[in-house]
Structure formats: structure tokens, C-alpha cells
């Protein structure tokens, strides 16, 4: 499935039905009064969060969503039927903004949560409303009003408690694969992961915690370089970050600095988010090299790294123990 996490759509509420001019036509009532009914109201457009959806792909080819119009009024003061609600399903974690102003209209995070984004127009009035002492046979009626129409920006931000970050090829996908049932694409070259991967990791209680493997950042990601800018938004909701550094890289300390700089440049409080530092691929270094590199990383970041090997399954239990402690999970 193609992963789409941004979409622009236009929503339009239904037009209100017209009122009508009509008069009573009954036997033995030669001068029946006005009986024109009101038009029905136009239907609204409603967004609803659906936990079964994982992407905004449905909005790639359809951009205009219009609710049903109200029906015109009828004789005998019958009100026309109102237009039905148009309910549009979106993934949980979808932010909705007005496209022109950027104003946040809603953040749909819980399954079944709804947000009305365009109201339908009011139905017109029938001539029965205009009966007066001066005018016993009014022919005046009003037309229904147009519904609201708005351009919207939809942004999906994944609902994960733990985000796994790091430069390309640091081993993030391998880590989420061994910790959970996720099966991301894994290969020994940069940018293997082109979309965020979600995995559920079991807590000691048996409940699940969602981890997200975020595609590799590079220098300048916060300004749009590489893939990072497109996916940094997905760690905005996380409670904890796992920063993975490749022990076999040419300059692990420099790699650490790059990611920290990008988190700070992106903003949204990411640089201050609780974070665990993980030195992955420890099998690539000699035993005497690990302490030296660990000390360098701690001096730069202020965090003591945990040395692991995701590929060989080393120290993963210790990593999870630290995760649960940071999250306050028993």
C-alpha cells in the first residue's frame, strides 16, 4: 500500500432546498390560505477517525467532497427532506487545517471521533411564513442557501508512543523488526526505509506499545533535505525517542550531532523529548573500542549510550527495561 500522509481536499455542504408557494385546494374551502412548505437543510460534511485506515491514500485521486442538497418544500406545509450527512473516514491521528489560513480545525485521534468541516445551507421558507393581515395570499417564498465550502489540509501524524530515529542505515528497521512483529524492508544501504513503519511491542503486562521507525534523517532534513522533513511530524506525538547510532559508521559522534541538530531545527519540542541513546552494531567494534566510543558519545550528548546489536539480539531486554522505565510502565 502506498503511504500518503498529506492531502488537500475541498469540502462542500449541501445546498438548502427551496421553499415553495402553494395554496390550500380543498373542497368547500374556496379561499384556501398559503400552504407552501420550507425546503430541507443541506447535509453537512463530517470527518470521522477510523482505526482501520493507515494512510490518506484515498484522497490522492478524489479531492472534492460534497454533501447532499436539501429537497424543496411541498404543499400542505410539508418540509422538504434534509440532505444526508457526508461522512468521510480518515486515519486516527489526522490533523485538519484550513488551507488558506493554516488554522487548526481539529485533531482526530480517537476511533469514532468526528469533526464537522462544512455545514449545509439552510432551507428556504415557504409562502406560509408570509401570511399577514395585509396579505392573505402571499406568493413570496425564499430559495435555499448554499452550503459552506472550504479548502482543507489533512496531515497524518502517526500515533506512536516511541519513535526510533537516526541516520540512514543505522539499523532502525532491524531494531523494530526484532522488538515487534513489524516486517519493514531491510537492506544494507541508505534510505531502504521510505515510509514510517509501525510495530507493536508487548509490555510486561501483555499490553502493546506502538513503536515507529522513522525514515533516516540527514543533514538539512528540517529544511527539506532527504526524507526526514516529510516524516519528522510523525514523532511529534511520541512520548519517548530512541536515538540509534551506527557503531560501524565512519564518524558516529558526528552522526549523533547531525540528528540532534535536526531535532533542534525542526522545533515542536523534539529536542527536549525524553530520549534514549543506543549504540547499535556493537559487534563491529573490538571490545576495547566500545568504552572509548561510548564515553565520547556521552560527553557530546549528556546521555550514556546502551550498546546493543539488533541483528544479533544483544542487550535488547535491557533496552526495553529502560523504555518501560521512561514511560512509567511496569
Swiss-Prot record:
The keyword Metal-binding applies. Residues 160-328 form the OBG-type G domain. GO terms for molecular function: ATP binding; GTP binding; GTPase activity; magnesium ion binding. Its EC number is 3.6.5.-. GO terms for cellular component: cytoplasm. Pfam families: GTP1_OBG (PF01018), MMR_HSR1 (PF01926). One of its GO terms (biological process) is ribosome biogenesis. ATP binds at residues 166-173, 191-195, 213-216, 280-283, 309-311. Disulfide bonds: none annotated. Gene3D superfamilies: GTP1/OBG domain, P-loop containing nucleotide triphosphate hydrolases. Mg(2+) binds at residues 173, 193. Residues 1-159 form the Obg domain. It is found in: Cytoplasm. Its cofactor is Mg(2+). PANTHER family: DEVELOPMENTALLY REGULATED GTP-BINDING PROTEIN-RELATED, MITOCHONDRIAL RIBOSOME-ASSOCIATED GTPASE 2. An essential GTPase which binds GTP, GDP and possibly (p)ppGpp with moderate affinity, with high nucleotide exchange rates and a fairly low GTP hydrolysis rate. Plays a role in control of the cell cycle, stress response, ribosome biogenesis and in those bacteria that undergo differentiation, in morphogenesis control. Belongs to the TRAFAC class OBG-HflX-like GTPase superfamily. OBG GTPase family. This is GTPase Obg. It comes from Parasynechococcus marenigrum (strain WH8102). The gene is obg.
Amino acid at each position: 500500500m502506498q503511504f500518503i500522509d498529506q492531502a488537500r481536499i475541498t469540502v462542500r455542504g449541501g445546498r438548502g432546498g427551496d421553499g415553495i408557494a402553494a395554496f390550500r385546494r380543498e373542497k368547500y374551502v374556496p379561499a384556501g390560505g398559503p400552504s407552501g412548505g420550507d425546503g430541507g437543510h443541506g447535509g453537512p460534511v463530517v470527518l470521522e477517525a477510523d482505526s482501520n485506515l493507515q494512510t490518506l491514500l484515498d484522497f490522492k485521486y478524489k479531492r472534492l467532497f460534497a454533501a447532499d442538497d436539501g429537497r424543496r418544500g411541498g404543499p400542505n406545509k410539508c418540509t422538504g427532506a434534509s440532505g444526508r450527512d457526508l461522512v468521510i473516514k480518515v486515519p486516527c491521528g489526522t490533523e485538519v487545517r484550513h488551507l488558506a489560513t493554516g488554522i487548526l480545525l481539529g485533531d482526530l485521534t480517537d476511533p469514532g471521533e468526528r469533526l464537522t468541516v462544512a455545514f449545509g445551507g439552510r432551507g428556504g421558507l415557504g409562502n406560509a411564513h408570509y401570511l399577514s393581515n395585509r396579505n392573505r395570499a402571499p406568493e413570496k417564498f425564499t430559495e435555499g442557501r448554499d452550503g459552506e465550502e472550504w479548502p482543507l489540509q489533512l496531515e497524518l501524524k502517526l500515533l506512536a508512543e516511541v519513535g526510533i530515529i537516526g541516520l540512514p542505515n543505522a539499523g532502525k528497521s532491524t531494531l523494530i523488526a526484532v522488538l515487534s512483529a513489524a516486517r519493514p524492508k531491510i537492506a544494507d544501504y541508505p534510505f531502504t526505509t521510505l515510509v514510517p513503519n509501525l510495530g507493536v511491542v508487548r509490555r510486561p503486562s501483555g499490553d502493546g506499545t506502538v513503536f515507529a521507525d522513522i525514515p533516516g534523517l540527514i543533514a538539512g532534513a528540517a529544511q527539506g533535505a532527504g526524507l526526514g522533513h516529510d516524516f519528522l511530524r510523525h514523532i511529534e506525538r511520541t512520548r519517548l525517542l530512541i536515538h540509534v547510532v551506527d557503531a560501524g559508521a565512519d564518524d558516529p559522534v558526528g552522526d549523533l550531532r547531525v540528528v540532534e541538530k535536526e531535532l533542534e531545527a525542526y522545533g515542536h519540542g523534539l529536542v527536549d523529548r525524553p530520549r534514549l541513546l543506543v549504540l547499535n552494531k556493537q559487534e563491529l567494534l573490538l571490545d576495547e573500542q566500545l568504552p572509548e566510543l561510548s564515553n565520547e558519545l556521552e560527553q557530546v550528548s549528556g546521555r550514556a549510550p546502551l550498546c546493543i546489536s539488533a541483528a544479533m539480539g544483544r542487550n535488547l531486554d535491557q533496552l526495553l527495561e529502560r523504555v518501560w522505565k521512561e514511560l512509567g510502565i511496569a
